[in-house]
């Protein structure tokens, strides 16, 4: 029974540690705070993607 508790704690630890490595920019507001703009398709050539604005299809882009 103790093994189950240990595995459960380990599972939650892995989940919480993994969430810190995702992209931090996920809204229009945070994109603009990081000096980015939202692009519907892909980022223009002079910009690079730094996150998403409303979900996977809308990208947050910033100058290189």
Curated annotation (Swiss-Prot):
Assembly description: Monomer. Homodimer.
This protein's name: Beta-defensin 1
Family membership: Belongs to the beta-defensin family.
Classification via InterPro entries: Beta/alpha-defensin_C, Defensin_beta-like
Gene Ontology terms for molecular function: CCR6 chemokine receptor binding; chemoattractant activity; identical protein binding
Localization in the cell: Secreted; Membrane
GO BP terms: calcium-mediated signaling; cell chemotaxis; defense response to Gram-negative bacterium; defense response to Gram-positive bacterium; positive regulation of flagellated sperm motility involved in capacitation
Organism annotation: Capra hircus (Goat)
First and last residue of the signal peptide: 1-20
Biological role: Has bactericidal activity. May act as a ligand for C-C chemokine receptor CCR6. Positively regulates the sperm motility and bactericidal activity in a CCR6-dependent manner. Binds to CCR6 and triggers Ca2+ mobilization in the sperm which is important for its motility.
Disulfide bonds: 31-60, 38-53, 43-61
Propeptide: 21-26
Keyword Signal found: yes
PANTHER family listed in its UniProt record: BETA-DEFENSIN (PTHR20515), DEFENSIN BETA 4A (PTHR20515:SF2)
Keywords: Antibiotic, Antimicrobial, Defensin, Disulfide bond, Membrane, Secreted, Signal
GO cellular component terms given for this protein: extracellular space; membrane; microvesicle; sperm midpiece
Gene responsible for this protein: DEFB1
């Amino acid at each position: 029974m103790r093994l189950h508790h240990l595995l459960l704690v380990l599972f939650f630890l892995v989940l919480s540690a993994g969430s810190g490595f995702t992209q931090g920019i996920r809204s229009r507001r945070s994109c603009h705070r990081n000096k980015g703009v939202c692009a519907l398709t892909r980022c223009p050539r002079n910009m690079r993607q730094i996150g998403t604005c409303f979900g996977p299809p809308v990208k947050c882009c910033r100058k290189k």
